[in-house]
Amino acid sequence: DDELNVGPYDEKSTWGCIKKHGDHYMFELAEPPKGERAPVVSFRSTKAELKSIHFHAPSEHQVEKHEFCAEFHLVHEICSQGAPGDKYGQEPSSKIVIGVFANAVDDKDALQSLSLEFCTSLSTVKNSEEDCCVSAPFSFNELLKDAYSKLQRFYHYRGSLTTGTHDEVVSWFVLKEQISISSSMQDKIKLLDQPTRELQAMNRRIVLSKD
């Protein structure tokens, strides 16, 4: 019952547009073609549709004071819930965000192609003198390779957005299993200077751990 499930994350690339929101840059998914559906995450009786992706470097979450070189955020909007009386009740949040830690390694098999295309498009938007958006594909095959096993080990809590007005509207799922990115990709990410919110106090939040 406490499994986190996604689909169709392991299919073909998803197209979208990279835009600037305040000081941050993110990938917003385009409407899927007729007959296809956007990636969806489900937890208990709640389902949420993927809307945007962005990252922070270094990571915004820490594990036992350990900071990771980057953290991807997959932002989902809740689209359906269990009916009143459902044994799990209504999810009080309006978003589900999956956090994926990344560390740099000197390995030719480390994540490169996905982040390279993503970073190149981000740089184009960042260096533009006017507001603009750049169309780009985003493949989940590498980011969530072996997705099912990765998604079954996570930290879960209810908290806030880490950008904008920091509204308390998020059910967070931070995956315990990190991904590897190439050292050269880490350098490209740092050059983008994507803001990272400073570490926040727990403020009575309860963090659940699932293995």
What do these predicted regions represent?
Residues D1-D211:
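Alpha-carbonic anhydrase
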